[in-house]
UniProtKB/Swiss-Prot annotation:
A Gene Ontology biological process term: proton motive force-driven plasma membrane ATP synthesis
Protein name (database record): ATP synthase gamma chain
Record flagged with keyword Mitochondrion: no
A Pfam family this chain is assigned to: ATP-synt
Role this protein plays: Produces ATP from ADP in the presence of a proton gradient across the membrane. The gamma chain is believed to be important in regulating ATPase activity and the flow of protons through the CF(0) complex.
GO-annotated cellular components: plasma membrane; proton-transporting ATP synthase complex
Membrane topology category: Peripheral membrane protein
Subcellular location(s) per record: Cell membrane
Organism: Bifidobacterium longum (strain NCC 2705)
Single GO MF descriptor: ATP binding
Keywords: ATP synthesis, Cell membrane, CF(1), Hydrogen ion transport, Ion transport, Membrane, Transport
Source species, domain of life: Bacteria
Location (main, coarse): membrane
Length: 307
């Protein structure tokens, strides 16, 4: 009887958990479409800013910090985008694992990484392990706004533009989760600064071949009032747009990961309920069989006594 009461108690508690998991899954399902659309809609603007920066840097020969790394400064900024809440499967643990790997590689290369963390789960993880954190931000990791992107970008830009002797950094990395689809989300490491120029491969012309009628010619730019001032103006927009895009795709990934995790948890809870119900029914059947056996045995004993 005691085992049956314990099984009933476990079934009730598991049913309550299943309801919670299912509710979390439904909430995530209602948010994922919007999160995905917001992330996709932000990408064209970010790509346009990045193309503009690439064009500025590729077609000029300058020593602006946006394009040139200070080789004498070993300090490097690393921004990890984690989550505020749990119940998202391996989302935060994957980010932390990749961040730890990046920090190890930077240490091995003789760098001095400075850690910046967005998300309560990540900051709690590193604070518990007494890891020095340059700055942390929390709140709305599943629905980040422009304000938090601006706050983070201002902090990182100040660190990047600050001279080395005053604690500035020479590189800026960001670790985030890219939303591919509802099933696949991949952890990425992006070196945001200095800007890496992607050079197109050019084919060596064959003198025997006729030259094409049209050819890709690098456009000529005129910068007003000056190239340096244009770069100074576009740098904050570049950093903020890249960080905002990473925040949005990370939010979509977090929501998708939470939906998948809650769907799996709901299925596991229901399977556990079925298993516990079978055990309860078997226990009841055993109790009934034992009671019937005792009744039949007692009846046989009374019959023999009367004879």
């Amino acid at each position: 009887m005691g085992s049956q009461l314990a099984l009933k108690s476990r079934i009730r508690s598991t049913e309550s958990l299943a309801k919670i998991f299912n509710a979390q899954e439904m909430i995530a399902s209602s948010h994922i479409a919007k999160a995905r659309d917001v992330a996709l809609n932000a990408k064209p603007y970010t790509d346009a800013i990045f193309d503009a920066v690439q064009a500025l840097v590729a077609h000029t020969h300058i020593t602006h910090p946006i394009a040139v790394k200070d080789e004498k400064n070993p300090r490097v900024a690393v921004l990890a985008l984690t989550s505020d809440r749990g119940m998202a499967g391996p989302y935060t643990s994957s980010i932390i694992r990749e961040t730890e790997s990046l920090l190890s590689r930077l240490d091995a290369a003789g760098k001095q990484p400075e850690l910046f963390v967005y998300g309560r789960r990540g900051s709690t993880y590193y604070k518990y392990r007494n890891r020095d954190i340059a700055a942390t931000w929390e709140g709305d990791t599943d629905q980040p706004g422009v304000e938090i992107a601006e706050t983070i970008s201002n902090t990182l830009m100040d660190a990047y533009m600050k001279p080395a002797e005053k604690g500035g950094v020479s590189e800026l990395y960001i670790v985030y989760t890219e939303f591919i689809n509802m099933v696949v989300q991949k952890v990425r490491v992006l070196r945001m600064l200095p800007v890496e120029i992607v050079k197109n491969e050019t084919k060596v012309p064959d003198p025997d071949e006729e030259a094409p009628a049209t050819a890709d010619v690098a456009p000529l730019y005129t910068f007003e009032p000056s190239l340096e001032k244009v770069l100074d103006a576009i740098l904050p927009k570049y950093i903020q747009s890249r960080i905002h895009e990473c925040l949005l795709t990370a939010a979509a990934s977090e929501t998708a990961s939470r939906q998948n995790a809650m769907h799996t948890a709901t299925d596991n809870a229901r399977n556990l309920i079925d298993d516990l119900t079978r055990k309860l029914n078997a226990s009841r059947q055993a109790s009934i069989t034992q009671e019937l056996t005792e009744i039949i045995g007692s009846a046989d004993a009374l019959t023999k006594k009367e004879e």
